[in-house]
Amino acid sequence: MRFSAFFAPTLKEAPKDATLKSHEYLIRGGYIQQVGSGIYNFLPLGKRVMDKIRQVVKEEMDQAGAQEVMLGFVTPAELWRNSGRFEKYGKELLRFKDRKENDFVLGPTHEEMVVELAKGYVKSYKQLPLHLYQIHLKFRDEIRPRFGLMRGREFVMKDGYSFHANEADLIREFELMEATYKRIFTRLGLDFRVVEADSGAIGGSGSKEFMVLAQSGEDTIAVCDSCEYAANIEAAKRRAKKVDSPAPIASFSKFKTPEVKSIEALAEFFKVDPFYTLKVVVKKAFFDGGKSELAFFFLRGCDSLQETKACNAIGANELLDVSEEELIKAGLEPGFIGPYALKNLTGANHILFDLELKDAQGLIAGANERDHHFVGVNLGEFEGLIYKDLAEVGEGDGCPLCEGRLTYKKGIEVGHIFQLGTRYSEPLGANFLNPEGKSQPLVMGCYGIGVSRLLAAVIEQHHDEKGCIWTKSTAPFNLVIVVSNVKDPSQKAYAENLYNALQKEGIEVLLDDRDERYGSKMADFELLGIPYAVIVGKGLIEGQVELVNRANLQKGIVLADDILGRILEL
């Protein structure tokens, strides 16, 4: 491709709303153009990178035995109602009516659509397993689209769906997809971690995320410093926390604690470690059908509530903070809420305790009475308490798998795999006949990769102050030939001959034959991030050209007659 005829409108200034380097460089480099909030056009350079990523994904998915399809972008709303996600997905699901007042949605994922497909054709265990995937456009009506391709409303995704006769075969496919995804992201040149994850609005049981490590990442992951354990903070577990100080010894009794409303004040008042205090976080929980009620989550005073864990524990769609006025209206004393008689006092359906509180002794808890707390609280004496993993893992907490410690890292989610089970097939009536001739729901898995997001993720991990640094498998071109002076016949002729020779060798090469200043051409090379540049300049008189490595901007002198062989070795 000749740069003089190539549509690559580069810009000197960064977009005003660009806070990430990927957003800035992809727009400045002419890879993408913003046309609306969270909506981007892919220009020729961006399309070339997208195609490179798409091809890697397709090759590995096909190798794993999956079959490519293309499902409708528009989905009948009735399918989403039947699966129970029409309300649960919230306002991010774009809903609309056609001219006949039929309800439709723009699919952010396609579980419902693919189940409907399988329902019509898969009738017997003999047709299983089956894995279908697509690389297609999606739409999610983000409330605050930001960070360029990282969090847009319109995006390209690889979404795959597998169907099985039993859980064992699903687990086999799940493990196969984990290995396949690892190969994909390794081929793309990414430093990534596989982490335990929450299933979110997709549902199902086991799930894992693939996180590209980058300080600009939106997700926080807990990583062990000694083993391979890693998990999204929303799903991270830890070794049970312990403290050096012994539990306070006190018989059960009520103490007057005037204006002692915070955990810090309570620990100071009784001269104990916050570990031995009982904290309650009260939230207003919202469920399907618009129903809402107060939910109570008890933890040790030194811990924080992980809201995603809490939301999942009670099956809520959303949790919101509760004001002191709302607590008082419910008959509670803010700052003094405890487990004793709480059910009778509030009629609450959701009173949960963190797993690490099971059989805890010597605790200090609110007495549900102003200016009073109980000491000597032993939770093992309570009956019918519900224990769930509620606490957020902190840096320095113990790894659940070894004696190591957990640290935080930032990551960009680029892939997510799920064990769905019968989460969709059962409500949508997708059944098959097993070997005994009995009807049962299809067992499912689903597997996603953010294809357009990967463009941004590569740059977030591979850039410098000058621009993009594409990896070998994602670069729009392998190499650019920079003609220092296009008015010099010898430079131009040599560049043309090298360009033709490289094309014959199957090298994707960009010939910068523009009548521009040398400095401008090099600035564009650095901005675009093509892996290598051959500079044809004054050194040609002495039979020399320069080879520049974009990753480190190191230059090397190469004999003009040897450059073709040198390039083929790269």
UniProtKB/Swiss-Prot annotation:
GO terms for molecular function: aminoacyl-tRNA deacylase activity; ATP binding; proline-tRNA ligase activity. CDD domains: ProRS-INS, ProRS_anticodon_short, ProRS_core_prok. The keyword Hydrolase does not apply. Its EC number is 6.1.1.15. It is found in: Cytoplasm. Keywords: Aminoacyl-tRNA synthetase, ATP-binding, Cytoplasm, Ligase, Nucleotide-binding, Protein biosynthesis. It is an enzyme of class 6 (ligase). The keyword Protein biosynthesis applies. One of its GO terms (biological process) is prolyl-tRNA aminoacylation. Catalyzes the attachment of proline to tRNA(Pro) in a two-step reaction: proline is first activated by ATP to form Pro-AMP and then transferred to the acceptor end of tRNA(Pro). As ProRS can inadvertently accommodate and process non-cognate amino acids such as alanine and cysteine, to avoid such errors it has two additional distinct editing activities against alanine. One activity is designated as 'pretransfer' editing and involves the tRNA(Pro)-independent hydrolysis of activated Ala-AMP. Homodimer. Belongs to the class-II aminoacyl-tRNA synthetase family. ProS type 1 subfamily. This is Proline--tRNA ligase. It comes from Wolinella succinogenes (strain ATCC 29543 / DSM 1740 / CCUG 13145 / JCM 31913 / LMG 7466 / NCTC 11488 / FDC 602W). The lineage of its organism: Bacteria, Pseudomonadati, Campylobacterota, Epsilonproteobacteria, Campylobacterales. The gene is proS.
